[in-house]
């Protein structure tokens, strides 16, 4: 009887050791995933910090009341807002359009969806959007994360770093890139987007995106249906 109990104890010890090793292995895999993800997020912040735009503006002297031109430089996240709402845009090669627009927002309100590419500003953010797509894709395709909910948790970390004007640019940019658009709709990446920042005639309606792009609960329902 004693020998039988000893064998049973040994068997239980082996089971416990195996479970502990599996737990340690799972923890190491998750830590490796997170380390890579946070490296990617740090690079994303570096790309934002590297954004720079120089423009000229008129300033009136307090003493002489005369106007003079000065050059100013904006950097980082400020560039997103400036390009969207303030950058002067005109189309000298278009004989039917002599208007100077104030930001991409006005171009979108004039030309609709086609105005995004017509403005010729989006290439400034090419590296930014390509890397953001890599981050979302890395999470979505991760074998270390089990199911939509686990992946959504990390997508939430990414989304939490997006400013209001980054979300606006993401909304318009992704209309032209189906793969990015699909990830946005899958994980409600635009749930914090404020519709009042969108150009006129654009909204959170299904004409542009599936409801899941803005509604995490709906995105969860769709994901669970797919996982069944």
Please report, for each region that a protein language model flagged, where it lies by residue.
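Transmembrane signal-anchor/signal-peptide helices with a preference for the extracytoplasmic
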Residues: 1-17
